[in-house]
C-alpha cells in the first residue's frame, strides 16, 4: 500500500550550486515563505544540470509530496533543461505557447534585441501547464499538475525574478487551492556573551514546548533563539509567541540585545540616536571591522563620526596621542593602551563616545604573557572609561578572533549606553 502524498519539497537545480560557486539563498527564502503560509515543508534537494538525475529527483518527489517547487534551469542555454525534463518524466509533449512567445518578443524588443532560437525555447511548455508569468525576466515558470494530487511550480534561479513570481502569482494560487492551513509566525531573539550550551540550559523547559517551539543556534559569538508558532490567524500565532518571548528576555537579561533584524551595530546606533550622542572608534587588530559593521547600516553617519585604524604604534602616538612611554611600559596590547586609544578617539574626533580594540589576532605575535587571542577593549564616555579583557585562544584562527572582537567591542559600548 503506497503512502499518501503530503507536504511540499523544494528542488534547486544548477551545477553551480553543487560546486559551491553560489549560495543557495532561494531554498532558504522559499522555506521561510512556506512556513509563514502554513504549508508543511519536509524536504529540500539540490541537483545539477543533468537530465537523468533531475528526472530521478522529480519522480521521487512525485511519489511522496503534494507540491514540488523547482528553481533554476529555465534559461535559454542548452544546459537549462528543467522544463524538458519535467515533460519527459510524465510523458507529455512540449508545445510552443503563442502568448509566451509574444511576451518574450516584447521584452527583448524593449531591450533592443530580437528573438533568437535560444530564447524561443523558453516558450515551449508542457501541454496542459499553466503559465507562471515572469514580470522582470524572460523565463516564465509553470504551474502544472501532471498527476492527480501532485503539482509542480517552476521558477528561474535568479532570486529577484523568483521572488516576484512567487509573491505575485504563486502565493495567490496556493491560497486559492486551500493549501494554506493557518499561518506560522516566528520571532528571532539575539544574545551576546553566552555560549549556546549555557543559554540552552537556562531555557531548557521552554525548549520542550510544541507550539510555540523554541530552537537555539549559534553564529560566531552570538546565540539566537527562534520562537515559532502556528495559529489559525497571524494574530493568534503572535499571541502564542508573546509570553514565551517575554520569559526568554527575562532569563537572558542584559545578554539579550535585540530581535529579528537587529544587530549589535544597529542597536548601538539606535541607542546613540536616542541620546543624541556620537561615536568614534580606534582599532588595531580588528583593522576597521567595528567601523565597517557600523557603516554597513544606512544612515549611520548621523551618529558615527569615523575611526582610526591605528595598527602601528607610531599611528597610535601621532593620531590618537597615546603616550610613547605608556606604549613602552605596558605594550600595545594592554588595558592602559586600549583606554588611551578610546580616549584619544573621543578627543581627536570630537565624539561623545570612543571605542578601542587592541589585541593579538595571530597566528604569530603572541608570547607567554600576551598569547594569541588576548584582546583588550575600552569605552570612553562622558562619565569615564570602562575596560574589558578577552582571551579567545588560538584554536579557531585569526578571522574568528577578529570577528568576536568586533562583537565584543560593540557589546561593551551597548552595555554602557
From Swiss-Prot:
Gene3D superfamilies: 3.30.70.2860, CinA-like (3.90.950.20), MoaB/Mog-like domain (3.40.980.10). Transmembrane segments: none annotated. PANTHER family: NICOTINAMIDE-NUCLEOTIDE AMIDOHYDROLASE PNCC (PTHR13939), NMN AMIDOHYDROLASE-LIKE PROTEIN YFAY (PTHR13939:SF0). Belongs to the CinA family. NCBIfam families: cinA_nterm, PncC_domain, PRK00549.1. This is CinA-like protein. It comes from Synechococcus sp. (strain RCC307).
Amino acid at each position: 500500500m503506497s503512502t499518501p502524498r503530503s507536504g511540499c519539497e523544494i528542488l534547486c537545480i544548477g551545477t553551480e550550486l553543487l560546486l559551491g560557486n553560489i549560495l543557495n539563498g532561494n531554498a532558504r527564502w522559499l522555506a521561510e515563505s512556506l512556513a509563514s503560509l502554513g504549508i508543511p515543508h519536509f524536504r529540500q534537494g539540490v541537483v545539477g544540470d543533468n537530465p537523468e538525475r533531475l528526472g530521478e529527483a522529480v519522480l521521487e518527489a512525485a511519489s511522496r509530496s503534494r507540491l514540488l517547487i523547482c528553481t533554476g534551469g529555465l534559461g535559454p542555454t542548452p544546459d537549462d533543461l528543467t522544463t524538458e525534463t519535467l515533460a519527459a518524466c510524465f510523458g507529455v509533449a512540449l508545445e510552443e505557447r503563442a502568448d509566451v512567445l509574444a511576451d518574450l518578443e516584447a521584452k527583448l524588443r524593449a531591450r533592443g534585441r530580437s528573438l533568437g532560437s535560444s530564447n524561443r525555447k523558453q516558450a515551449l511548455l508542457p501541454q496542459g501547464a499553466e503559465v507562471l508569468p515572469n514580470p522582470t525576466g524572460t523565463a516564465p515558470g509553470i504551474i502544472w499538475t501532471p498527476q492527480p494530487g501532485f503539482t509542480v511550480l517552476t521558477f528561474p534561479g535568479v532570486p529577484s525574478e523568483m521572488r516576484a513570481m512567487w509573491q505575485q502569482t504563486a502565493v495567490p494560487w496556493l491560497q486559492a487551492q486551500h493549501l494554506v492551513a493557518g499561518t506560522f509566525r516566528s520571532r528571532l531573539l539575539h544574545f551576546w556573551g553566552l555560549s549556546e550550551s549555557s543559554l540552552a540550559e537556562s531555557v531548557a523547559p521552554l525548549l520542550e514546548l510544541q507550539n510555540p517551539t523554541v530552537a537555539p543556534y549559534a553564529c560566531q559569538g552570538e546565540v539566537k533563539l527562534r520562537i515559532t508558532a502556528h495559529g489559525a490567524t497571524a494574530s493568534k500565532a503572535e499571541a502564542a509567541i508573546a509570553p514565551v518571548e517575554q520569559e526568554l528576555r527575562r532569563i537572558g537579561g542584559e545578554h539579550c540585545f535585540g530581535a529579528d533584524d537587529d544587530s549589535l551595530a544597529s542597536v548601538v546606533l539606535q541607542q546613540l540616536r536616542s541620546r543624541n550622542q556620537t561615536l568614534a572608534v580606534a582599532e588595531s587588530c580588528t583593522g576597521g571591522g567595528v567601523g565597517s559593521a557600523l557603516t554597513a547600516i544606512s544612515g549611520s553617519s548621523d551618529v558615527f563620526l569615523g575611526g582610526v585604524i591605528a595598527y602601528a604604534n607610531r599611528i597610535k602616538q601621532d593620531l590618537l596621542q597615546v603616550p610613547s612611554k605608556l606604549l613602552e611600559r605596558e605594550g600595545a596590547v594592554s588595558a592602559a593602551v586600549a583606554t588611551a586609544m578610546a580616549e584619544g578617539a573621543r578627543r581627536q574626533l570630537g565624539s561623545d563616545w570612543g571605542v578601542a580594540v587592541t589585541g593579538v589576532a595571530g597566528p604569530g605575535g603572541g608570547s607567554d604573557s600576551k598569547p594569541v587571542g588576548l584582546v583588550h577593549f575600552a569605552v570612553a564616555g562622558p562619565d569615564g572609561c570602562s575596560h574589558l579583557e578577552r582571551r579567545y585562544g588560538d584554536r579557531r584562527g585569526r578571522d574568528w578572533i577578529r570577528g568576536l572582537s568586533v562583537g565584543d567591542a560593540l557589546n561593551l559600548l551597548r552595555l554602557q549606553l
